[in-house]
Amino acid sequence: MSAQSVEEDSILIIPNPDEEEKILRVKLEEDPDGEEGSSISWNHLPDPEIFRQRFRQFGYQDSPGPREAVSQLRELCRLWLRPETHTKEQILELVVLEQFVAILPRELQTLVREHHPENGEEAVTVLEDLESELDDPGQPVSLRRRKREVLVEEIASQEDAQGLPSSELDAVENQLKWASWELHSLRHCDDDATAENGALAPKQEIASAGESHEVPGTLNIGVPQIFKYGETCFPKGRFERKRNPSRKKQHICDECGKHFSQGSALILHQRIHSGEKPYGCVECGKAFSRSSILVQHQRVHTGEKPYKCLECGKAFSQNSGLINHQRIHTGEKPYECVQCGKSYSQSSNLFRHQRRHNAEKLLNVVKV
């Protein structure tokens, strides 16, 4: 390869899950209009997750200068979000999905990622299926430890806001800026532990709360609380299941202290800590910690769609997909906006609707 061709290549060092490094050379060439374009074969690129990780882990020291750093970040972001093949809504869902997975407890992050969800709705379905299968769904705090419905209180009503040092005011301003995109995209976790007082429990308190649904604690961000965690945007009872108080739990996890009434449930749970994935797909080699997950995955290869709508005959590979589809026929709209009362059949539609409310709130606060 000539020196000129090397200079025209954009070289990205991408760590794979085994912490090895491989070099992807993205050849840039002139398009017919004289502008630079990419000759990337999108179908043969590695998993977008690799580029997402590299994009987030990229450091300034990884490039010779600021211009090169921006160029590398732009290319990594493009290879992750792939605007050439994804719509704006799909790109939005990828960003929402990333943030949602990031706020999950580490153990749940592992379980969600091995399903390779393509959007937030699929990630939520994974957690719902997990809770319905595990023996101890009565501890939903780990799944719902954060309120996603973020409402911004008027700064003028904060008595202490007038006396804030400039550094804290800057912190407040920065929160307003990034909240308009990052936080308001994920308003879908119903947290019984904070429904009464709107407070956010620290991770340590949540972990020790055990069976309790009332977890004390407040949001500590180093500045006065200008963010208020509002009511849930999910139907009441979501992530909940009635429990049998007489059922004793004699099996205890040595890692986290969680109790189970059946030894089989404990074995499944312990794979979260050990990372064991004994169920492998013979088609593609992917491994999973639970046989039920493997069964769902194999439908990607077989095309099997065992869940059929009795109204129109449309079939789905997962029961959750059928449930969502049936709302078209029944007219059910369980996802309600707590600010205006408008209801939707899909949580993703509610997310988009709430963005409008949150943007208006943020603009009003900035104008104060």
UniProtKB/Swiss-Prot annotation:
Crosslink Glycyl lysine isopeptide (Lys-Gly) (interchain with G-Cter in SUMO2) sits at which residues? 22, 27, 147, 177, 236, 277, 286, 361, 367
User: InterPro entries under this entry?
Assistant: SCAN_dom, SCAN_sf, Znf_C2H2_sf, Znf_C2H2_type
Q: Where are the zinc fingers (C2H2-type)?
A: 251-273, 279-301, 307-329, 335-357
Cross-link annotation Glycyl lysine isopeptide (Lys-Gly) (interchain with G-Cter in SUMO1), location: 27
Location in the cell reads: Nucleus
The record's gene field reads Znf24
Q: Which domain of life is it from?
A: Eukaryota
**Cellular component per GO, a single term:** nucleus
Which GO MF term does the entry hold, naming one? Answer: DNA-binding transcription activator activity, RNA polymerase II-specific
One biological process term in Gene Ontology: regulation of transcription by RNA polymerase II
| Modification Phosphotyrosine occurs at | 335
- Chief location of this protein? nucleus
Could you list this entry's UniProt keywords, alphabetically sorted: DNA-binding, Isopeptide bond, Metal-binding, Nucleus, Phosphoprotein, Repeat, Repressor, Transcription, Transcription regulation, Ubl conjugation, Zinc, Zinc-finger
Sum up the protein's function in the record's words. Answer: Transcription factor required for myelination of differentiated oligodendrocytes. Required for the conversion of oligodendrocytes from the premyelinating to the myelinating state. In the developing central nervous system (CNS), involved in the maintenance in the progenitor stage by promoting the cell cycle. Specifically binds to the 5'-TCAT-3' DNA sequence. Has transcription repressor activity in vitro.
> Pfam families under this entry?
SCAN, zf-C2H2
Domain SCAN box stretches? 52-134
- Family note: Belongs to the krueppel C2H2-type zinc-finger protein family.
- Mark the residues carrying the PTM Phosphoserine: 132, 142, 274, 292
Region Necessary and sufficient for nuclear localization: start and end of each range? 251-301
Q: What is this protein called?
A: Zinc finger protein 24
